[in-house]
């Protein structure tokens, strides 16, 4: 399998367009024409992680946090530059799945929820998205070639299904006049053609490529086509809310979460004996959603990187917070490995997939 094929699989399951506009996801370093020798999943791409990839003869690293995020002004033999140089010198590809993995229904937040053992899970902040229903009219004899052209561009796909079209037959008519150069018919003569009305769905960001595909592949000089905008509730969204199988006190839950996530420390705001049954989680840095989680009935909001004033505000407003540190997202290493094994199972010439055991938490705890 080549990197380009892997990128297509990833885009099908963890769409890159679902990432936040400020994010930097996808193939950050590498060559999409290279064959994959192995994949190593990691939270952060550090020098130690790159060394591990070299030792494992693995030429592809998939990290949650982008190595190239802020503007890189120079690549020298220190800091991030040394990591980038080592990746390039050893022909190692670096792929980032960040906020697009955060909002995925099987992504980081679901992995954290599963680790804690939440049940009856739903999303905190479901996104709404738009798409288009496309309809155009094709002479019957050209319909299959036209559909093939659209499919080659990745259009008319729904999840794991290709060639998602609906056809209905009819009869079209036209009369070429003036300087017309008809593909079918003669000047100044009404032509009747057996046509197929072809309908299919596209994502919101596929409008321009679809328009160009129709104009380039339709046999008519001036094809008729419509784009009908439609809205739907997305299956993607940020954060998970679910229930514990039994009620605990806030103090008990903090110890339980620490143990389940295997992290060195936690801290919380709120009364130690507050009853906890319904739990909301946003991995990484999720402050800003704690009040929505509370409105949804969460007894505690679990996240990382909680600042003093945010914690104080929540405490004053009786919103319980549990800080599990940003590094708790490390659960994605094994979680993503399992997802990749499922997504790539049907492909031949398999390669090993590893979850890095290297701890990239920059903090030491006492």
From Swiss-Prot:
InterPro entries: DUF34/NIF3 (IPR002678), DUF34/NIF3_bac (IPR017221), DUF34/NIF3_sf (IPR036069), N-reg_PII/ATP_PRibTrfase_C (IPR015867). GO terms for molecular function: metal ion binding. A divalent metal cation 2 binds at residues 65, 326, 329. One of its GO terms (cellular component) is cytoplasm. A divalent metal cation 1 binds at residues 64, 102, 329. Keywords: Metal-binding. Belongs to the GTP cyclohydrolase I type 2/NIF3 family. Homohexamer. This is GTP cyclohydrolase 1 type 2 homolog. The lineage of its organism: Bacteria, Bacillati, Bacillota, Bacilli, Bacillales.
